[in-house]
A protein has these predicted regions:
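Transmembrane beta-barrel strands of outer-membrane/channel proteins
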Residues: 202, 227-231, 244, 258-264, ...
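Residue-level signature of outer-membrane beta-barrel architecture
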Residues: 248-250, 280-282, 323-325, 371-375, ...
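Repeated loop/turn-to-beta-strand initiation elements of outer-membrane beta-barrel proteins
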Residues: 198, 223-225, 252-258, 284-290, ...
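Outer-membrane beta-barrel "beta-signal"
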Residues: 246, 528, 560-576
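Transmembrane beta-barrel wall of Gram-negative outer-membrane proteins
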Residues: 269-373
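Periplasmic polypeptide-binding modules associated with outer-membrane biogenesis and secretion
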Residues: 24-233, 263-272, 276, 416, ...
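C-terminal outer-membrane beta-barrel translocator/porin domains of Gram-negative envelope proteins
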Residues: 345-513, 549-561, 572-575
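Residues that define the transmembrane beta-barrel architecture of outer-membrane proteins
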Residues: 210, 238-242, 270-274, 313-317, ...
Length: 576
């Protein structure tokens, strides 16, 4: 009886409270739309530091070349279609009119070969053909052989797939002389096709001078499996949570992939999440169509929220096109455009149409730029930029909607996001990772579009999206040490320490909610890997500033740190 009276009283109170009060009762991480970030896998840079270059056999000088001397009057270079004669002049200008050795002539041929190689023409070389040279004044002729790919040999099992491979071969063989950038682009585009992985080699043509044959081998992987278990959830939805996904690669032989994801809290009534991704490569140049959809629902499980019968449901759909403007081993640039649709709902006491229950329906577009580059020092840089704009219409809720997740949040929003990172090896197994995230909005945002601090990347000592804001700056620094070992089945033993910091700002906060947040954390951990299939991340984290610390009281305008709390996290990931 008393419980029933209490529930009625609480319900009556909740109907009359403001959005500010709801924001304090329901943490941002447990509001609809925020659960998606838990199950999004961060983009991995495609760029890799340059490997060993393709090299053509050098031209060895004959015995006695270092002792044979001549006066060099002029150099004549024949067979070059890439460069004008004047572009070679700097390579031998200091030799003209001087007494030089025959070895110097062969060294000049090597410099010409190196010039071709530096510009990507790795199959081309300069030769010293047989000729009569006057020791008292010689005109030396150098013959350039500009190498090219005469033929690409693809495995016969590719004949059952949509034929992009003839296009790749045509692009590669049409270029004379062959440039490694062209060869690399089309082999990498082939390797981006779902479920197909390639190895290649080059062999000389049996009859044609300067010609080569590109031989390609393929490995087909029809299914990818992924699983993760961790304790990075929240008290209301976790903290133990899981994620599984299965990808069907190219089953229709039309260069498509379908991924189905099932995830949630261990107590699935608190949070259940379904996701699906379909993508298809439409052209041999890598133009790709994609559709991503997700559906999450649950009843967060703290005593307070259970008493209020708080429930959430969120749906998200996006569809668009992406195109690899640059696809190379050491640098990549991909541009995407998409339309998105979202429907995020929460309810108290099964009263979805009565405040403080919430309803956000958003429609809009995003433009994404994803770039990465590796440099000669071994560092890998990554850039991720997103421009998002929402529309009022097309089925969205209206601005000023009494059920909006934030009183002044707008559906016709505009925001930009930028993520930068660099991983730099320092030698001796030591490396450092630096990352920064920035979001800027010009109007107040609804909850699902706000930036969050807290989770696996930034704010690691905090729950996912422990803080949210319209505008954010977040920084991360991580020092790593790879431990050498002799275990063949161990792919990684790595110690690391990190520190991160976040500054968040809310535009037009309602009374009782935070305008500015300043939070930070630090920690250390151990990463282990087995056979590149299983990895374990164990870490201790300490929140050194921000809400979430024992004794902290959130007040408008600031967050004051008290006694720091320490947390232990684990992440176990497997893939096949």
């Amino acid at each position: 009886m008393f419980a029933g009276v209490r529930a009625i009283a609480v319900a009556a109170a909740m109907v009359s409270v403001s959005c500010a009060a709801v924001a304090q009762v329901v943490p941002p991480s447990d509001q609809p739309g925020r659960e998606r970030e838990r199950f999004e896998r961060p983009a991995v840079p495609l760029a890799q530091p340059g490997g060993p270059a393709i090299a053509v056999p050098g031209v060895e000088a004959p015995p006695g070349a270092k002792e044979t001397k001549l006066i060099l009057r002029r150099v004549k270079i024949v067979g070059s279609t890439v460069y004008a004669d004047s572009q070679f002049a700097d390579l031998y200008a200091d030799l003209i009119g001087r007494t030089v050795t025959l070895q110097a002539i062969y060294d000049l041929a090597g410099r010409i070969t190196a010039k071709y190689g530096a510009d990507g023409y790795v199959l081309s070389r300069a030769l010293v053909p047989p000729q009569q040279l006057d020791p008292n004044g010689a005109v030396v002729t150098l013959q350039v052989v500009e190498g090219y790919i005469e033929k690409v040999e693809w495995p016969p099992q590719l004949s059952s797939y949509v034929d992009f491979f003839s296009d790749y071969a045509a692009r590669i063989t049409a270029e004379r002389p062959a440039n490694i950038r062209t060869i690399e682009r089309y082999l990498l585009l082939a390797g981006d096709l779902p479920g197909l992985k390639f190895k290649n080699s080059i062999k000389p043509h049996p009859t044609k001078v300067g010609a080569a044959i590109l031989v390609v081998e393929v490995t087909v992987k029809p299914v990818d499996l992924f699983g993760r278990v961790d304790n990075r959830g929240t008290n209301a939805r976790g903290p133990n949570q899981f994620m599984t996904s299965t990808t069907a690669n190219n089953w229709l032989h039309i260069h498509d992939a379908l991924t189905v994801t099932y995830a949630g809290a261990f107590k699935t009534q608190q949070l259940t999440y379904w996701g699906a991704t379909y993508r298809q490569v439409l052209t041999s140049e890598g133009l790709t169509a994609f559709v991503n959809a997700s559906y999450g629902f649950g009843r967060p499980g703290t005593a307070e929220l259970e008493l209020l019968e708080y429930r959430t449901k969120s749906q998200y759909l996006e569809t668009g096109l992406s195109y690899p403007v640059i696809r190379a081993r050491e640098r990549n640039l991909n541009i995407s455009g998409l339309w998105f649709w979202s429907d995020d709902r929460s309810s108290f006491f099964d009263l979805p149409d009565t405040p403080p229950s919430t309803l956000d329906k958003m429609r809009g577009f995003r433009v994404r730029v994803d770039a990465d580059a590796a440099d000669p020092s071994g560092g890998i840089n990554q850039l991720y930029f997103v421009l998002s704009h929402g529309f009022q219409g097309f089925g969205s809720t209206q601005n000023g909607n009494e059920l909006a997740s934030r009183a002044f949040g707008r559906v016709d929003f505009t925001k930009t996001e930028l993520t930068l990172s660099r991983m730099q090896p320092l030698g001796g197994g030591v490396s450092v990772l630096g990352a920064a995230y920035w979001q800027h909005a010009i109007t107040p945002l609804l909850v699902s579009e706000q930036c969050g601090y807290g989770g696996r990347v930034f704010g690691r000592a905090f729950d996912p999206s422990a803080f949210v804001g319209d505008t954010c700056v977040e920084l991360l620094g991580e020092l790593r040490l790879d431990i050498p070992h002799e275990f063949k089945w161990v792919s990684q033993i790595q110690l690391y320490g990190y520190a991160d910091h976040g500054w968040l700002h809310n535009i037009a906060p309602v009374p009782g909610t935070l305008r500015n947040v300043d939070a930070a954390s630090l920690g250390a951990g151990l990463r282990l890997g087995w056979l590149n299939s299983l990895s374990v991340d164990l870490s201790f984290a300490q929140a050194v500033q921000g809400y979430g610390l024992t004794g902290t009281q959130p007040v408008p305008g600031q967050v004051v740190a008290a006694n720091p709390i320490r947390r232990f996290f684990f992440i176990i990931t497997g893939k096949l």
